[in-house]
């Protein structure tokens, strides 16, 4: 944007040294009211934006600062460029006739990228507040300064055009296998230093493509002051954390992911913000971003503030941030954290600790309408995007379109499946017969939403132990149980998500201050686990019957669901042209010989994967690789097969019908 201005001073050098120009005089903006209504424009207008203005006929580049602080009596920008003296750079309050926008702005010539700055505000009574980082800042320093840094979004030259212009696809009919990762603890250097974004591009991306994952899901990368929050206490929603490099470095990482055919989803945290004094808390001397009543504005469990979803500027701030990550970082999706805490006014509260809505209920209508708006905006601007909800309740229609009364997400994590299946598999095999309904229960609601089966970081922290250590039995049985369980997961309807370390059979609980236990790969059972997960991913992507109807009941049929005494489950999966894959899981250490299973059609079942294979450090129990159907009715069906199902194993067979 080229901006014109007339100055009374003829001394350009003196002007540049003074360097601070009244924004009302020099900047032609969108009308303030329009700016505050357009989230797509806000992420490119608010904060520190590089602009050019004409001063006495000369084109001068600089930075325009724009911040929302309606209750402040004064706002200044301070930094190295003015010796951190607030008097040098007082912002001007932007007003129109009969309208106070709440915006403050200034243009400072000749600032470069990488300039350190903060805002210094005084409240409505003239009291100076703690210096603030830019709510819209694109780049920030770490402790102790937490300074914002000027950054120009347009400098990075993307090379992912083929990925960005690929045809729009129905994601619920695609194979989606997510690798959930915490950047700071996947790998560390020998001295304990983090891998940078660029180093990860050279190491992580080849690893994930070899392993057959389709998407990387990153735990929150938005800037956060406390490493131990894992990113879930963000201060800078518009800034990828500088712990691992610059915004350009992060763009490079995503660019390389796309060139390798790997999608990138970010965990996103619109549910709350931390109380750190340099952030949004008490920003202009008031509860600008949260409800001042702690019954609505304070999260007791997380000791953080809850956004006030009924305020226009908060809603637009969050919608703008969601759009920002797609526009400027080419991400492929957002996984929205802690949705349940947004939906319910009484979330984690006792009687008397919350305020009902206008109808006397516990739904947060403002949050519900905001989530719908966010999803509508994202899918409108980016039709290939994925919006994913981490929602732990039975709230109706989470992944139903807003036009049909839903929240408008594309997918929802299946927390019920995770809870029930883990509860079952943790039982000693001899007792599983008494908990059979626990493992079959999730199929009663498997198609009520577009589900992702998630084995996330939440299940391997806070004393819960690793997935491997949840498994009962001796070392061999633990490993076999986990192999069988992962096989069962990949055969179930629903997209797949595994937290890092699952694929190597991590034995220790996840520790954000250390890397994964890569040394385990020197042992055969862990190498076997890695090979199994790799083969499960590649098999899953190769057979449409395992993914195409993940969200449609037409894609799943039980063959045996009631064999509680045998702790055995058999089902078939279908694609849209009725190709079939049969999946059988034996959750006991007793092999099942000549186990008869009813099937509807004549043909041949051909083995495609066996989790008990010696390749995976299994027992390699002898089984039948090709099974012909028999004209012998069973389980209410006209044909049947006699299978051998190895101990503590899941096997996959593809169906080949007899020629017509």
Which ranges hold each PLM region?
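Substrate-binding/active-site clefts of carbohydrate-active enzymes
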Residues: 141, 161-173, 182-363, 627, ...
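Conserved, mostly hydrophobic/aromatic
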Residues: 67, 119, 181, 208, ...
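Solvent-exposed beta-strand/loop surfaces of large extracellular or lumenal domains
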Residues: 81-103, 612-636
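Conserved alpha/beta catalytic core and glycan-binding cleft of carbohydrate-active enzymes
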Residues: 143, 330-332, 347-515, 520, ...
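The feature marks proteins involved in alpha-glucan
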Residues: 1-64, 94-180, 185-192, 199, ...
């Amino acid at each position: 944007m080229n901006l014109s201005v007339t100055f009374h001073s003829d001394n350009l050098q003196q002007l540049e040294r003074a360097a601070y120009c009244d924004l009302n005089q020099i900047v032609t903006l969108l009308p303030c009211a329009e700016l505050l209504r357009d989230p797509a424009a806000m992420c490119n207008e608010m904060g520190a934006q590089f602009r050019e203005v004409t001063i006495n006929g000369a084109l001068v580049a600089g930075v325009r600062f724009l911040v929302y602080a309606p209750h402040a009596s004064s706002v200044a920008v301070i930094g190295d460029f003015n010796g951190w003296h607030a008097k040098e750079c007082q912002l001007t309050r932007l007003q129109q006739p009969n309208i106070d926008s709440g915006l403050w702005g200034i243009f400072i010539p000749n600032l470069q990228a990488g300039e350190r700055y903060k805002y210094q505000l005084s409240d409505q009574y003239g009291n100076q507040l703690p210096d603030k980082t830019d709510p819209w800042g694109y780049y920030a320093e770490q402790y102790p300064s937490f300074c914002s840094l000027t950054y120009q979004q347009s400098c990075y030259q993307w090379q992912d055009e083929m990925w960005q212009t690929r045809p729009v696809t129905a994601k619920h009919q695609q194979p989606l296998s997510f690798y959930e990762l915490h950047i700071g603890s996947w790998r560390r250097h020998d001295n304990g230093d983090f891998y940078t974004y660029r180093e990860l591009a050279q190491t992580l991306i080849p690893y994930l493509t070899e392993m057959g994952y389709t998407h990387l899901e990153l735990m929150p990368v938005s800037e956060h002051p406390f490493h131990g929050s894992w990113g879930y206490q963000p201060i800078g929603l518009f800034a990828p954390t500088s712990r691992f490099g610059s915004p350009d470095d992060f763009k490079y990482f995503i660019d390389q992911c796309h060139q390798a055919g790997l999608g990138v989803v970010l965990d996103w945290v619109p549910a709350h913000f931390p109380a750190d004094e340099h952030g949004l808390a008490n920003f202009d001397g008031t509860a600008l971003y949260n409800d001042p009543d702690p019954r609505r504005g304070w999260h007791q469990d997380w000791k953080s503030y809850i956004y006030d979803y009924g305020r226009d500027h908060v809603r637009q701030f969050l919608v703008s941030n969601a759009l920002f990550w797609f526009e400027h970082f080419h991400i492929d999706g957002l996984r929205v954290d802690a949705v349940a805490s947004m939906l319910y006014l009484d979330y984690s509260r006792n009687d008397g600790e919350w305020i009902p809505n206008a109808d006397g209920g516990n739904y947060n209508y403002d949050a519900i309408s905001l989530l719908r708006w966010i999803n509508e905006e994202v899918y409108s601007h980016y039709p290939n995007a994925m919006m994913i909800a981490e929602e732990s309740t039975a709230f109706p229609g989470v992944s139903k379109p807003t036009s049909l009364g839903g929240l408008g997400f594309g997918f929802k994590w299946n927390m019920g499946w995770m809870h029930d299946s883990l509860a079952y598999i943790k039982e000693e095999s001899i007792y599983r017969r008494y908990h059979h309904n626990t493992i079959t229960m999730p199929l009663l609601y498997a198609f009520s939403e577009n589900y992702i089966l998630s084995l996330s970081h939440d299940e391997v922290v806070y004393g819960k132990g690793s997935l491997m250590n949840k498994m009962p039995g001796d070392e061999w049985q633990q490993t076999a149980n986990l192999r069988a369980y992962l096989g069962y997961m990949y055969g179930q309807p629903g997209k797949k998500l595994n937290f890092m370390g699952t694929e190597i059979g991590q034995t220790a609980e996840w520790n954000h201050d250390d890397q994964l236990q890569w040394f385990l790969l020197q042992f055969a059972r862990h190498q076997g686990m890695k090979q199994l997960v790799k083969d499960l991913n590649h098999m899953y992507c190769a057979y449409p019957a395992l993914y195409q109807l993940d969200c449609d009941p037409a894609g799943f049929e039980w063959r045996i669901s009631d064999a509680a005494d045998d702790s055995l489950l058999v089902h078939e999966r279908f694609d849209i042209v009725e190709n079939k894959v049969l999946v059988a899981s034996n959750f006991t250490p007793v092999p099942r010989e000549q186990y008869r299973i009813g099937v509807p059609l004549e043909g041949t079942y051909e083995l495609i994967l066996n989790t008990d294979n010696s390749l995976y450090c299994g027992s390699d129990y002898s089984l039948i690789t090709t099974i012909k159907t028999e004209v012998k009715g069973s389980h209410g069906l006209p044909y049947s097969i006699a299978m051998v199902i190895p101990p503590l194993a899941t096997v996959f067979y593809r169906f080949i019908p007899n020629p017509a």
